[in-house]
Amino acid sequence: VMALGLSSLGLILLPPRRIAFALGFVVCAGLMAWAFWLEHIEGLSPCPLCMFQRVAVVAIGLIFLAGAFHDPGRVGAWIYAGLLFVASASGAALATRQVWLQSLPKDQVPACGMGLSYMMDTLPFVDVIRRVLEGSGECADKGWVFLGLSIAGWTLSFFVAIAVAGFALVKRD
């Protein structure tokens, strides 16, 4: 186990980079398992913004998995950190949009729109992305709340943590 000194926080022990990448993958797999549990067992249907956030979590998981197998050196770690940042920033933007929609007064919430699968079947892909990013009434429904945060709030926290963790992996050397 290696140590990374942080000025005001003291020492934080970090595992070797390959193990850290593997742990990142396991966390993403756990988040996806939780999402499927909420959907299929608890009956919470994901809105289109939720589905796009799931894509971001899967992308992050695949980047972590590739890093675990590759075990990159310093330059490779910077590349993985950049990829993790792009994927987590994209997810954070989606989650931020959903948190904003959830904060709107009821009379300002957009009307419910088409389901994602229907949009994918009938609209050009660019229009699907535009409509999903605009949000709809179902995206404003908080559904499940824990410690005052909706699922979108928790995923936003996850995406921010991943952006930071990706660059912490670079500091391993």
Please report, for each region that a protein language model flagged, where it lies by residue.
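Iron-sulfur (Fe-S) cluster-binding segments and ferredoxin-like electron-carrier domains
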Residues: F52-G67, S117-D121
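Interfacial segments of alpha-helical transmembrane regions
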Residues: L14-F25, P72-L94, V164, A168
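C-terminal TM-helix exit segments that contain a strictly Trp-centered aromatic cap at the helix terminus
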Residues: G30-E39, A89-P105, F125
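Extracytosolic (periplasmic/ER-lumenal) interhelical loops and adjacent juxtamembrane/interface segments
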Residues: S103-L147
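Immediate flanking context of iron-sulfur cluster ligation sites
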Residues: C28-S45, F64-G67, R130-R131
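A hydrophobic membrane-anchoring alpha-helix module
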Residues: L133-D173
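Structural signal for the C-terminal ends of transmembrane alpha-helices
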Residues: M2-S7, L65-G73, V164-D173
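Non-cytosolic membrane-interface motifs at loop->transmembrane helix junctions
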Residues: L44-R54, Y80, P110-G113
